Each structure stands twice: as C-alpha cells, then as structure tokens.
C-alpha cells in the first residue's frame, strides 16, 4: 500500500506531466484561460489516463511484448513494434466514447472544450503516460495508480494556471508580455515551484 501511495504522489508532484516533462502543452496553454473549462478538461484527462494506461498495460503484457503470446503457442513472437499504434488506437477509442457521453449529458462542457476534446487523442501527455508505463515495466496495479496520478497532476497544473491567468486579467502586464508571453513566464515559475518536490524521497 505504501508503494502505491508513493507512486501516486510521485506521479502528481515529482513527475508532473505538464510541469516536469512539459507534455500536453498545446491544450495546457489553450484551455487554461477559464477555470471552468480547465477543470472540465482536467477531469477528462484524469478519466482518459486512468482507463488507457492500465488497458495499454494489459495489451502490452498479453499480446505485444516478446514472449507474451506463449499461451497461443508463439513464444518467440515480439509485437512490441506495434506498441505506438496500439496505444494511440486505445486512446482514440476512449476519447471518442467520452466525447459522445459529454455531448449527450454535459453539452455546455462539450461546447466549451470544442476542438480540444478530440485533440486529447494526440495529447502527448496521454501517450507519454503509456510509454512511461512500458519503459518502467509497471504491473497492472501500478499502471492504474500511475495513470490516475498522472491525470490528477496534469489537471492540478492546468486548474492552477487557469486561476492565475484569471487574476492576471486585472494586472497591469506590459504590452509586450500580454497573452502568451506572461503565460510562458507563469508556467516557468510554476515549474520551478514543482521542482522543490524532486528533493522529497518517495
């Protein structure tokens, strides 16, 4: 249990997808103008990561990795070269299901997210989590915890940035830094703040 808690905290704070690895920056910067939209996208990313990382773990360990098809009488087959294609396919399917659910039950959030909802499919933070899972050889349980933690970390970062950007609207920002300029500086300072967690031994 302690191991899983350590993995969760590490995924949220120490190895934050947005502020440590700078993954998913396209949607991170575009949707962080309002807290409501940022929260909606953050929740969507948490759900997608929590589902896709363990599903991709199952596919990798039962079909793709070398020797995984031993149960089918094919012990020397290595399909790991299909990993990238498989992970993207799983992510696309989950995002498509989520898009249909939001369109039907929460149309306001669906409209607020707009084109960025289907873009979660190619969000490198989503794909990056699955690739990290394979690289670190996580078990199914570890993948589930890591996927959830990575999603929560990314959501925490985008919601925090949205809150700061809403406050910045009322600040006297120099003309040359308005818009993305001050946002990049803000993200950099947030990243420096999150670096303090790297000194914690988990």
From Swiss-Prot:
Protein name: Na(+)-translocating NADH-quinone reductase subunit E
Gene: nqrE
GO biological process: respiratory electron transport chain; sodium ion transport
Top-level EC class: translocase
Signal sequence interval, chain numbering: none
Record field: catalytic activity: a ubiquinone + n Na(+)(in) + NADH + H(+) = a ubiquinol + n Na(+)(out) + NAD(+)
Gene Ontology CC terms: Gram-negative-bacterium-type cell wall; plasma membrane
Subunit structure: Composed of six subunits; NqrA, NqrB, NqrC, NqrD, NqrE and NqrF.
Location of this chain's protein in the cell: Cell inner membrane
Enzyme Commission designation: 7.2.1.1
A GO molecular-function descriptor: oxidoreductase activity, acting on NAD(P)H, quinone or similar compound as acceptor
Membrane topology per record: Multi-pass membrane protein
Family: Belongs to the NqrDE/RnfAE family.
Function: NQR complex catalyzes the reduction of ubiquinone-1 to ubiquinol by two successive reactions, coupled with the transport of Na(+) ions from the cytoplasm to the periplasm. NqrA to NqrE are probably involved in the second step, the conversion of ubisemiquinone to ubiquinol.
């Amino acid at each position: 249990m302690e191991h899983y808690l350590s993995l969760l905290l590490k995924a949220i704070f120490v190895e934050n997808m947005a502020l440590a690895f700078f993954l998913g920056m396209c949607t991170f910067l575009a949707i962080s103008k309002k807290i409501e939209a940022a929260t909606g996208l953050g929740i969507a990313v948490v759900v997608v990561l929590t589902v896709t990382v363990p599903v991709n773990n199952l596919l990798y360990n039962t079909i793709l990795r070398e020797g995984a098809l031993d149960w089918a009488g094919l012990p020397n087959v290595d399909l790991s070269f299909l990993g990238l294609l498989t992970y993207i396919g799983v992510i696309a399917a989950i995002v498509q299901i989520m898009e249909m659910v939001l369109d039907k039950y929460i149309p306001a959030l669906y409209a607020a997210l707009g084109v960025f909802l289907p873009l979660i499919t190619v969000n490198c933070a989503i794909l990056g989590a699955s690739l990290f899972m394979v690289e670190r050889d996580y078990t199914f349980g570890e993948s589930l915890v890591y996927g959830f933690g990575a999603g929560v970390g990314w959501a925490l970062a985008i919601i925090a940035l949205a809150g700061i950007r809403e406050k910045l609207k009322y600040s006297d920002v120099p003309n040359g830094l308005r818009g993305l300029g001050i946002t990049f500086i803000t993200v950099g300072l947030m990243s420096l703040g999150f670096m303090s967690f790297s000194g914690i031994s988990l």
